[in-house]
Amino acid sequence: MSQRRRRSLARPAALLLAVAASMALPALAADTAPVTLKDAYAESFLLGTAVNDDIVAGRDTRAQALVPRHFNALTAENVMKVEELHPTPDSWNFGPADAFVAFGQKHDMFLIGHTLVWHNQTPAWFFQDAAGNALAKDALAERLRAYIEVVAGRYAGKVQAWDVVNEQIGEDGTYRDTTWVRGIGDGDELMRLAFTYASRYAPDTELYYNDFNTWRPEKRDGIVRMVKQLQAAGVRIDGIGMQGHWGLDYPAIADIEAAIDAYAALGVKVMITELDVDVLPLTKEGQIIGQGMTHPQFQLPEFKRFLDPYRDGLPAEVQQRLADRYAELFALFHRKRDVISRVSVWGVHDTMSWKNGYPIPDRTNYPLLFDRQYQPKPALDTVLQVPRKR
């Protein structure tokens, strides 16, 4: 065979190989493309985060890009709290909350309004009459009804869920001495009123109770009792949000699992909400610590160095502990995916985390899955790996 004939045969063969290779490239790219959180857990539960107004409004553009890539559920961090929506008796401010809803709808996300009933971030006037005196029980109940009518009614059909009541049960399982409990006079009645009104004005919206330290046996049992009394009264409650403000070594996985099982046994949805993992010293019992840290002794330089040891960066060994902790938490969540409907981290990147200022102000914390440069941390990779190993 002549050289010319060989070359003429080689040309179509080479062309076929080139076409085949070009067709294979997209498949190869798809196989090696980094998986996202929502994709990794698509068959397990929703993967959510909390967003602030900077993200929604586009002032934090890099975080805004990360949100729809990794998450399919959104909680309003602050813009749906009473002090934001209804700051004075004569004023309403729906702009930021409306923008939150529009952002979530644009990206086809499951939206959680947060929150209708909470003693914090609710202005003092809400509990007072025009003269500044405490409202009588019936007047406060009517104010609650009217507020829920306006807010839950406005967003009915736009948000898929509400954290109706937030943080009203204490560590011993009884009701906390909050402005809401004092004003209504009975915690059980407060719950019945709040969930009744929410169900009335948002009939197709899921209704949740949300709280911290829900893993503690005494508090867990108090929440279980509260849910049972609502159910016995025929009042709808659809889920329990277990806030995940946890640390590198607490709470024990067994305690979290026992709480998940107890809430699931009620026939309601279970969600892990507000998840972040604190790496700093003195974080457990944050409300108590925050009060104690106001003492002048703790303002001395040596205490500041002890309390804020990672201002210049997180050591590799602590970074690894953080990754290991996230891995064991998500391994539990994945194992319980038949009863857990959503896991939400409380923020996108470390800079925006409330843990930089709580329970001790002006610290540098590292509780989330993306760092201050918006880069994924080793913890993110461990979380992504969990479903692949099961």
Regions found by a protein language model. Name each.
Residues 47-51, 72-76, 111-115, 160, ...:
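Hydrophobic faces of well-ordered beta-strands that scaffold small-molecule active sites
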Residues 35, 73-87, 96-215, 281:
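Substrate-binding cleft and catalytic face of glycoside hydrolase catalytic domains
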Residues 50-61, 82-95, 169-174, 213-222, ...:
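Acidic-and-aromatic substrate-binding clefts and catalytic sites of carbohydrate-active enzymes
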Residues 54-69, 143-151, 218-230, 326-332:
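Short, acidic/polar
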Residues 38-42, 61-72, 98-110, 152-156, ...:
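Acidic (Asp/Glu)-rich catalytic clusters
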Residues 33-37, 125, 154, 163-188, ...:
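Aromatic-rich peripheral "rim/lid" segments of glycoside hydrolase catalytic domains that contact
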Residues 13-24:
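Bacterial N-terminal signal peptides
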Residues 31-73, 77:
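Boundary/entry segment of secreted carbohydrate-active catalytic domains
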